[in-house]
Amino acid sequence: MKNILKTQVHVVVIYLLIKIAFSQVKTDFDVNWSTSKMVRITNRLGDGLTLNLHCKSADDDLGLKILAPNGSWSFKFRTSIVGTTLFYCHFTWPGQSKRFDIYDDDRDGVRSHISCINCIWDISIQGPCMFSESDHAFNICYDWNGNLRT
């Protein structure tokens, strides 16, 4: 009986030590496998044009938004741990209908050369331009086919 009680005490002590060790490891080495991001879109069409936009991902439909001239809208999300996050937007204004991948993990994620945490976009008739945090300017510009403009 004494040996059984002693064994049970040892098991409990070992269990508690393991639990404490793992809780400490989580605290010290807590890796956030997904990253929090923010996308802001501003209407820079000019000529007093209103911009309608509808953004989606595979999991989220963010609904129709209507931006007055120079108006902005933003949303936040967490990226996928496998690096496949994609949000695309359908943009319309009088006489035009365009689509653009407003956040693409391959282009904007931590493994890309343009990585952004706050992905800030100006939408013009020529195409979207993203704010460069290193240059402090909207100089990462694309045409509506997704090609980088020079």
From Swiss-Prot:
GO terms for cellular component: extracellular region. SUPFAM superfamilies: Cupredoxins. Its main location: secreted. Belongs to the plant self-incompatibility (S1) protein family. It is found in: Secreted. InterPro entries: Cupredoxin, Self-incomp_S1. Glycans are attached at N32, N70. The gene is SPH3. This is S-protein homolog 3. Keywords: Glycoprotein, Secreted, Self-incompatibility, Signal. One of its GO terms (biological process) is rejection of self pollen.
